[in-house]
């Protein structure tokens, strides 16, 4: 376990220093050490995916993650890889499904915003950015983003199919405004 921890830390440091060949060498050793422990092997596989993503190899990242159970780390890495490969919109449904049961996951809201932007859906992207701020409990920033969405609709920057999204933005803006008023009253 100690050797695995040391190899993991050394690999992560090499990735951060952008020494990808050294990281791959360390990762191969880590894979050997963790082979008999499924949980540790999963962590090594996730680190391998992170390495390839950092090295600019999104397709290799997706290959490493293929067949992995749909847990949050895999979802985040797959989305980042698809965004890097300009295929972010492929992950929209999976991200929305995750957020239906984990609405306070700011990272996933930000990834959803990026997929919407890549798919030329600015109003949805602004709403997702606002929801990320709500998840961070930064209601002031969230209200700013919701207002930006309302302004986008007023300026005609939203498509006709965005009517439902505009309604959601209006409702969420009112809810966030109410929270801000409550917080101000408590002070």
Model-predicted regions and their roles:
Residues 54-60, 85-93, 119-128, 157-160, ...:
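Alpha-helical linker/edge segments of TPR/alpha-solenoid repeat scaffolds
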């Amino acid at each position: 376990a100690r050797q695995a921890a040391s190899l993991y830390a050394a690999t992560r440091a090499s990735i951060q220093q952008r020494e990808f060949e050294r990281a791959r060498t360390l990762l191969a050793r880590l894979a050997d050490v963790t082979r008999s422990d499924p949980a540790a092997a999963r962590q090594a596989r996730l680190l391998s995916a992170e390495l390839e993503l950092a090295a600019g190899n999104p397709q290799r990242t997706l290959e490493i993650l293929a067949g992995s159970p749909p847990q949050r780390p895999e979802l985040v890495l797959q989305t980042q890889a698809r965004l890097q490969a300009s295929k972010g919109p492929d992950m929209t449904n999976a991200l929305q499904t995750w957020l239906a049961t984990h609405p306070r996951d700011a990272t996933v809201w930000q990834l959803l915003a990026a997929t919407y932007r890549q798919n030329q859906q600015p109003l949805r992207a602004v709403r997702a950015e606002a929801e990320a701020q709500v998840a961070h409990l930064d209601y002031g920033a969230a209200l700013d983003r919701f207002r930006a969405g309302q302004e986008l609709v007023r300026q005609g920057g939203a498509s006709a199919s965005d009517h439902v999204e505009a309604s959601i933005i209006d409702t969420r803006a009112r809810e966030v405004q109410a929270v801000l008023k409550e917080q101000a009253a408590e002070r």
